């Protein structure tokens, strides 16, 4: 099956008429997967759709579209003067892309902010799996992508040396990470945003990237990881040369590093429709330069929004009056971060819903693959819930007031299921927002109810006297834990290794993006050391209140 995936022709160029004839022939031939692209110019340009048809005469378009394809297929290939048929207009994609632009940028896209976001997915020269962020702003996309990439390494490549990962392997890990984020949208189809190139006099017509034999083998593995084996096999059989030829027809001659204005960029956006994630992985393998070129990060961000669907995104956000990308500073809002991490664009980081002044404000509704902790919680700007603090994998995006970085570990016990003791401690602390390690005696019944413990009034009154014998009006955390969870050990180890990533070169030693490793120690007791001059430790303490960490090589990583 792997041979089918990587067996693609990457040979010489086709003339425009040849490409048109071959694409039309492929559309009429036997194929079961539908792949649609639509030109979604945001103002006055046309939106187009091409469908690789099924073996029956039916297609995803109207019958007129099918007959048009048949006429194109019967036309002589040598008729170079015959113009390529214009596929049908996809008004939905055009409308949604226009509204997504408004949702992200507001009424006007500032040139300087747009330039900060205009970068591709690029790896560090000294840390082959670490993405580089060239300027402030796109960390709202780059940091979550890096987190998912590291999750794949931790879970699927145990024991691998990060410094020995090849470039081809890193590229395929990136594709898997992007597919994971798209899968979180739980959409019936995947709408991938593509930058159509302007015709020119360049000699290279296609953008299909030449890969080494090892790289092609890695591409097959990436396709397998992105979807089930059945999905990958279906994609391999259903879209053989047709996907490649269709991609070449889309990828007109153009300098991929040409600088575009915001209007020019949005006028060239097209969409490709895929039924399964394995086909998306194949597309990215065949068109890796769409990720690596100047607008790769923006294209993927638009793909996530379009795949999720504008109506669902707007329902998650609730308040769409403010753009998701700050018009002055260029950083992404929490809704954008949450969409990349969880597939839902909710604006808050607490668990489930909270009633604030009669308004139901939505937070994170389930345990996420990737966690999130932030310095802003220590500053009392927000409360991060258990779903984000205790993700499925030991990877957390870390937020400062201006930037996002990534914390990760190979220690899987950091995300093992909570013991009853840890649940009790967490619930108790949720009633102690100031971090004083005590609660009001009157809150004891609420805590017991939250823990599903006995909460009869007579029993609560008895426990209040026992836990507050001097009638001070407070119950200490230690007294509560000793009474209800005596001698229970915690699941988190006392010492473990942590690693940190910051994608901005200027925030790294010698301006080279790399991972920094440290040894963490969880101290006895519940009193945390206060170190206001160390934002890294302060942020870590929102997850592990009694943590201390010694960074190797004496270098303290930066959150900014």
Swiss-Prot record:
One of its GO terms (biological process) is protein K48-linked deubiquitination. It catalyses: Thiol-dependent hydrolysis of ester, thioester, amide, peptide and isopeptide bonds formed by the C-terminal Gly of ubiquitin (a 76-residue protein attached to proteins as an intracellular targeting signal). It is an enzyme of class 3 (hydrolase). It comes from the Eukaryota. The modification Phosphoserine is found at residues 212, 219. The keyword Ion transport does not apply. InterPro entries: EF-hand-dom_pair, MINDY-3/4_CD, MINY3/4. Its EC number is 3.4.19.12. Residues 15-30, 52-81 have a biased composition (Low complexity). Keywords: Hydrolase, Phosphoprotein, Protease, Thiol protease, Ubl conjugation pathway. Hydrolase that can remove 'Lys-48'-linked conjugated ubiquitin from proteins. Belongs to the MINDY deubiquitinase family. FAM188 subfamily. PANTHER family: UBIQUITIN CARBOXYL-TERMINAL HYDROLASE MINDY-3, UBIQUITIN CARBOXYL-TERMINAL HYDROLASE MINDY-4-RELATED. This is Ubiquitin carboxyl-terminal hydrolase MINDY-3 homolog.
